[in-house]
């Protein structure tokens, strides 16, 4: 899905922890937020060291945990 050209895309730099179904996890980042007409929130997610480019997917807070972006 190419949402980069869609109106309403908010560009961000948000560190995250991504949890996978097999119990493993990895660090990643969200570089954009977008909300569809039904109100579902989407994020542009890139998993670090995965070799895959960032992609848009529905935001699932049980799978993608937001980490502090700065300061303590």
Locate predicted features.
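Basic/aromatic-rich interaction segments and small domains that mediate binding to polyanionic partners
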Residues: 3-5, 10-23, 31-62
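Acidic, negatively charged sequence signal
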Residues: 7, 67-72
